[in-house]
Amino acid sequence: MLIVSYCVVMTPVILSVDDEQDVTDLVRFHFGKAGYEVLTAASGREAIETIRCRRPDLVLLDLMLPDIDGFGVCEILRRTANTAAIPIVILSAWSTTDARHVGLELGALDYVTKPFRPEDLVVRVNRLLQWCPAPA
């Protein structure tokens, strides 16, 4: 009798939501090197549509977007049953305590200010994904 077991390794998927191409390129490069699949969206509406089509394991979310701002996207994701558990990390140039407080109150798990060290962000995301169960 031959017993074969399979181990399926899932590639973690993150969605980078930012209207600055340089930021999405930086995220794609560093997270790609770390073994992630990186989806991108340049607006709040595009982010919501992308998530409807393909649920990421985590969202990196800028606040200053051309249509729905990051706070609005965060609020929409948290109010929707099938997206409420997706971990969100805000990645923004807004470094005020008020912006950080609002983002965390709306359900983001972390708040990282730009400029940021990509290597540090990868480590933070790795840790969050270890602690948070994968979305169903």
In which residue ranges do the predicted regions lie?
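Active-site beta3 strand of CheY-like receiver
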Residues: 54-60, 65
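C-terminal output helix
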Residues: 116-126
